[in-house]
Amino acid sequence: AVVECNLEDGSSAQCYKFTVAYQPEGLEIGPFCPSNIDEKGGIWDWDGEKAGLYRLDRDFFEMLADQGYRFYDKDGRIVISDPGSGQPPEADHTCLMATPDKDVTITMLLPIEPRMAEKALSLGTVAKVGVALDGVPIFADAPSVLDTGHLPALDVCGGHIDPGGWYHWHATSTDIATVEKTEGVAVNCALAQDASAAFGFAFDGFPMFGSLEADGSKPEGLDKCHGHMGETRLGKTYHYHASTEFPNLPTCLSGVVAENNFSTTSSTGIGSQGNTRRGPGQAMPPGFEEAAQILGVSTEDLMNALKGNGQRPNIAAAAEKLGVTEKALRSALPQPPQHAR
């Protein structure tokens, strides 16, 4: 449907409003967490020592154990928890795997006529990126193991189930084969791969494509959001391109997004109307909402400030960005789970 909407720059516009199911019919998802270290699960973009994209297998979990993050018991069984259960994990380090809820629906808003913003919108942890052509929502990085102690496993196409019960992407899934080659990881996503195809639309209304132009050439003149103006199958327009490394999504949005552009019928998780139960792998790690309240900032601003470039957050830089002292920030933040080498 076409509806009147308000954009985040204060202007009025017309938006497409549409509702989708928890997961497209016929979409194959998984695997996520393996049941033991001898099985192969999904993938994870590790941002600690020896950072990179990995399959969730024995080599990966033993590497994490060597770094002090042990996700399996003495028999090699992976410790798995459901972040949508409302109960905190019973161990310091668990592989998170939510349960789908077939009754959940998702409603989104996209501007019909995209407008460039005066300043690009930075996309921090679990920020809303857009929606794929198959109707699956797209989000930025999932919370880091370094922040929460827990691992919200992605499947081999770069998606997983939100604690609210609905599936979403954390990657340009139709071009993840390019990432597979770049990262040297056997991903084997079952989705049809096309590096030049349209993947979806960002929440500012601009289209998102794979890592190549329609003619198979590499895109030129990309800005900091990995977008540019140029000819596409949709005509000449500003558009985004996937990167060749994981996560292969825009790091910021160049256009203006609609207010309240994402909601679900779930009682928990991102976009829920009554989100009173949060846990690792949800919109915010445990204790971060309380920290934001103590500091007098929004949870989104707090997570964006703490989001590093593949390593541990720079507390001093985050404090400066938030306009608080480093001591105040360290005091407010929850302590991560202890791990021993």
Which stretches of residues belong to each language-model region?
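Short helix-loop boundary/capping segments
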Residues: 146-154, 164-218
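Extracellular/lumenal glycan-associated surfaces
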Residues: 104-110, 132-136, 162-177, 233-247, ...
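Short loop/beta submotifs within extracellular cysteine-rich repeat domains
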Residues: 118, 138, 175-180, 208, ...
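Disordered, low-complexity segments in secreted/periplasmic proteins that are enriched in proline
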Residues: 268-293, 303-317, 327-341
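Long, compositionally biased interface segments
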Residues: 4, 219-282, 338-341
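Solvent-exposed N-terminal domain segments of exported/luminal and surface proteins
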Residues: 1-147
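Intrinsically disordered, low-complexity segments enriched in Gly and acidic/Ser/Thr residues
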Residues: 193-223, 278-290, 309-313, 336
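Short, recurring structural edge motifs at helix starts
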Residues: 152-159, 221-229, 303-307
